[in-house]
Swiss-Prot record:
Misc note: Bacitracin is thought to be involved in the inhibition of peptidoglycan synthesis by sequestering undecaprenyl diphosphate, thereby reducing the pool of lipid carrier available.
Transcription regulation found in the keyword field: no
Protein known as: Undecaprenyl-diphosphatase
Chain coiled-coil ranges: none
Species per Swiss-Prot/TrEMBL record: Pseudomonas aeruginosa (strain ATCC 15692 / DSM 22644 / CIP 104116 / JCM 14847 / LMG 12228 / 1C / PRS 101 / PAO1)
Gene: uppP
Residue intervals passing through the bilayer: 47-67, 85-105, 108-128, 187-207, 218-238, 249-269
Top EC class, one word: hydrolase
Amino acid sequence: MEWWTAFQAFILGVVEGLTEFLPISSTGHQIIVADLIGFGGERAKAFNIIIQLAAILAVVWEFRGKIFQVVRDLPSQRQAQRFTANLLIAFFPAVVLGVLFADLIHEWLFNPITVALALVVGGVVMLWAERRKHVIRAEHVDDMTWKDALKIGCAQCLAMIPGTSRSGATIIGGLLFGLSRKAATEFSFFLAMPTMVGAAVYSGYVYRDLFRPEDLPVFAVGFVTSFVFAMLAVRALLKFIGNHSYAAFAWYRIAFGLLILATWQFHLIDWSTAGEV
């Protein structure tokens, strides 16, 4: 493995780990950064699956206590049964739309301009949602109803547009639907588990011929890096939301999106092949 390839894997692992669970769009950042450092082609498709799995495993590890409790109580406890049902209900809309439109979305929307516009629009919506007066109905994830879960699941479908952010769509959706900031964030993390695992399994099957033994060192670098930085990002976000709003992420989205649009408009960067991964 050449040093430059290892460096590319490290950078993209960092990007995936830091952005997957922050409301700033990991897919959008991956498209932009991968193009800037020249990481593309068939290997990139398999690599992205690996680093996404690493990120979700980091969340599983962070919430292992809650997961164990739910699994233990599922046969007999109503609360655990309702929580599991809510996750499945929220997961369902993304499954349906993903199966029907994933290839079409990847073909038509995976480009820097879509990413930039989605970043800006999402940032504006995030600012509006934060400044809007909220009536909190569900302080904790266990207080959610199936209707809350379904609405958040529908909001998650917006994240199929690159640049929108899965966590951003579900967290802001949760806030608008009456969840506390803590409940919306935690449910977003839990919903990421079946959603991302399902997407990774589906993509892994579709691109199964792209996994080659000679790429294992590259995958290992990306996997470890993504896992470590995702764990750090999750811990930092959970601590951050205790005393802060999501406004800082909103302004970052807007600034980053406008920067991408400016580089495209004034031909400062050639984005012609971005997204071809």
